[in-house]
């Protein structure tokens, strides 16, 4: 009990707050339940930890665009979504972000956190229950999605999974063609 860190999955060693991304999440969720943790939190081997000094990782991973990518190309555990740092995260075709994009994404992500903070009694699972999301949290995610869709090249907020997939694969084709 004096040294609980000795039993943790080695990986992220940090003395600053970090973002936790679940390895497996329900396929029924509209958003990936991503969370910020303090350095003294020990995450299990079922959570990916990532440093996120400016809130960009949180915002991107919390968007509809990202979970659409994850649902489309990511792995599965039974029928649930399975996050992978290599396929899901590293393959995500995020364009180069301007300073303005970064600031807007960070602010939109902060709005999501503030909406969650209105109900501190709720767990992440309760916040993201498919039929039980608080309207304020839904609105915050809508704002994040509007920003993320614009960054990905949408002329307006995407309304369907198919619209997002078309953008994602166009961006992916563009990025992989440029690297040759």
Model-derived regions: residue spans:
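Non-catalytic DNA-recognition/assembly elements of restriction-modification systems
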Residues: 94-180
């Amino acid at each position: 009990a004096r040294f609980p860190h000795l039993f943790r999955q080695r990986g992220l060693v940090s003395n600053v707050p970090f973002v936790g991304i679940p390895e497996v999440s329900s396929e029924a969720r509209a958003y990936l339940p991503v969370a910020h943790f303090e350095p003294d939190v020990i995450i299990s081997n079922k959570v990916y930890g990532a440093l996120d000094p400016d809130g960009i990782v949180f915002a991107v991973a919390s968007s509809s665009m990202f979970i659409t990518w994850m649902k489309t190309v990511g792995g599965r555990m039974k029928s649930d979504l399975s996050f992978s740092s290599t396929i899901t995260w590293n393959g995500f075709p995020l364009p180069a972000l301007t300073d303005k994009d970064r600031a807007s994404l960070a602010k939109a992500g902060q709005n999501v956190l503030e909406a969650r903070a209105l109900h501190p009694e709720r767990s992440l699972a309760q916040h993201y229950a498919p039929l039980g999301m608080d309207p304020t949290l839904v609105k915050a995610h809508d704002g994040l999605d509007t920003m993320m869709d614009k960054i990905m090249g949408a002329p307006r907020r995407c309304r369907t999974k198919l619209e997002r997939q078309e953008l994602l694969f166009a961006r992916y084709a563009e990025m992989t063609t440029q690297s040759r």
